[in-house]
Amino acid sequence: MTSRFGQLTYTSFDAVGTVGGWQVKETTDALTSEETQLMLAGVRTVFRTVEPMPDYPTPEQLEAAPRRLAYSRVGETYAALWHTVPAGADSTGRPGNVFAHVLLDRTPDVAPRHRAIQWWRSPHWLCPYGATSVSRAALAEPGPEPGGVVTKDSVVAFALDTTTWRLATLFGLLDAVAAALDGGAPVVLGVESPDNAAQWIGLLSFLMSPGTAAQLSFSTFDRADQLNLHGGQVLSAVPLEDLSAVPAGMAAISEAETLSLGELGGEPHRTAGGYAIDVTPWSAMAQVVLLDPGSARRLLDDIDAVAEQVRDSGLHPAWPMAMAVAGRAEFADAEEEAHEVIAAHSPPGVAVGSAAARTISGVLSAVVGTTTADAWRAVQELPTGPGAVFADTTYLCRAVADDAWLSNSGPIPLGPRMFHGKPIPPPLRTAIGDALNPARGPERLLQVADLLVRAGVEDPRIRTTLVEDVVPRLRDAEARERVGADARLTLGAVLLNDGDANGTAIDDGLLDWLADTAPLPPPDELAQATPWDRTWTTAALRGVRAWRRGTGGAGRDAGALLWWLRMAGSADFEQTATASAWNPEDLLLAIGADPLPGAAAVRTLVAAADSPALNRLAAKVIDENGDSLAVACAAVRTIEPTVWLQQRYVETHQHAYVPLWDEVLSVVDPADVHPDFSTRLLAFALLGLFTGHPYPRACSGFAASDRLGGEAIERLMPLVGEGHLAPHAVVAISLLRAAAPPDPSHPDVTLDELAGHLAEQVATGMVGDDNDVEGVVAVMAQLSGDSAEPALRGYRKMVTKLMARRRDSPSLTARLRGGMQA
């Protein structure tokens, strides 16, 4: 069985059969490699004393020499102590050797629990000096046990020493350490000796519980240049001489200089160096309880007794002292601060009937007072914890029964903590039963329900009361007028939020009244809503009403209809979205942050006009949707011809998309295809024609429209002007296609005619001299593969005729079919 403690020594030595130098000298208790590495990570191999050690120190000098004890939690579950002493010269004669003796606690949270500083000057620490002593030093079993130098008696005597006033320093140190334990600046204490440092650390440790002290990482001796702001050490002691060199960002306190005390809720403490330390109830209580040795010593025992009554893990450092102070007449001047700490920081799980539980209960009862306003004040002031839960519960118990509180204008206030997913405390369960008495009337019952629902209370009696006692009375128009918007939304949320997605408990008239409470929220707002909050419920009520009216009668709530089908998990959502073309805003509202399923967006992508909402929809489909039809249509709506050509999508994507575009256009009624889609697709088709890549045959119908054809040409002309489409090539391809005999298998005459119109516009921008003519002829010869003189003469004739008549004829194709044969 592995023992609780493991030991390791580390130093520079030269043993037989080993390479000399810094190395692990010895280990015990079957240390694993992981444990060894954790222990080695905290070893310091430099120990620079303020005064140099004598070459040949006497035993008395060695005993009085500085030593370093450091403590920290390591790994996930371990704690370790590093005891380091100067060791003189090593076996090679090199001065400055150090001997580190490390103790690993494998189960630091298991009894018996000691404060780590109690190991200070334990007689079991190995402290060899000189190469011979280092070589002979050997670990003993068991490992070091707590010593008798730092005890409750010693720290009380140290704090209340009549020859040296230390309490002011202690009060500032308490608050600085409390802040550091909570993630604030690490604390550096300037001391006359490591022995003083040990007593300061002991005093701090005994004024908190053993479990909290286990989180107080410390060192009794460091030099300023060894301090690490982000090293995780809470408290470091340094020689007084080093205090001025402490890195910025650390709370530096000197035991030899006067600390100016502040006031709780007022001015902070200030060190001699000007560092400000916020005053906490911990130091305020300490100023009362640490005035005489007898009461101070009893306080330390009381702190441990309190800690034993609870789970001593994560306790606030001031809480055990506050519990010890509460109810003690001799500490009456600290009672207010003690109650503040107990209310704010009491832990969960305190045993019912224990002395600690009785103290906490008494304090919390005082904090919440006797009125609803008193409880509301406590809700606002208390931080999260059992005290806050008590205040929250008390406030709701009083609020639901307080007619005057419920009659205030506006929503009844709620604190920062809710009851969502939590069991209802028994006192609140009883209060709810009384508050839902039908005799209070529908308006008051609805106010109670609104408050409870917004607080996250889940109680079936709320819905039962609304259905049986409130809804029937809301058929009266006068009764409805007295119900505010928040209460209306709460009523709707409760009636729908019971697995009744169709709202069967709500008749059409009541549903109209509820749904008209607020306008439909925009998609971005609805995407951030949480189920059954105000925004979400508004959309739900409008969605249910639209569902009842059907797709044709949904009107402006069509998006809410789709959204509600999705929220309710309806199998009809995808089918409904796919079957019709929607306003893009409605689809975006319906889908929120989720991907659109399948081909749900296809008809909308084909049938909707260009708009920012359509752009967002198309981009969402491309980014998140795996349906090929939807992605192909989204590409048409969001990618401009220039990008399509420059990014070579015409080469990499168009071949795959052409059959998809044809498939979509074969099932969508031509009358439903929006001109914006037709024009964009027609531009892609022309790019395919001019670059030798496929294009959708369905575009022939679009090309027959003068309007669509003209707009498609306008989209491509900038590509010619910027040189992305070579002008000579455009004219050459157009002339060759116009002159080719008709191909029955590819009856795309209208697209060829449109290409001819584009060529006419391109030719209009040419100079029309021999260079242009010969340039086009050369491209025609290259494309046709026929550079014989008869062919060149024919091409030249076609180009010349085009240049001569380019501004006149509206039909290039019809004109040139006969020209080639002439």
From Swiss-Prot:
According to the record, the segments passing through the membrane are none
- Fetch the InterPro entries from UniProt: GAP1-M, GAP1-N2
Q: What Pfam family is a match, any one?
A: GAP1-N2
Loss of function: phenotype: Loss of DNA conjugation when disrupted in recipient strain, no effect when disrupted in donor strain. The recipient strain secretes reduced amounts of EsxB.
Further remark, if any? DNA conjugation in M.smegmatis is unidirectional with distinct donor and recipient strains; mc(2)155 is a donor strain while MKD8 is a recipient strain. Mutations in a donor strain that alter DNA transfer do not always alter DNA transfer in a recipient strain.
What's this protein's function?
A: May be involved in assembly of the ESX-1 / type VII specialized secretion system (T7SS), which exports several proteins including EsxA and EsxB. Involved in DNA conjugation in recipient (MKD8) but not donor (mc(2)155) strain.
The name under which this protein is listed is Putative ESX-1 scaffolding and assembly protein SaeB
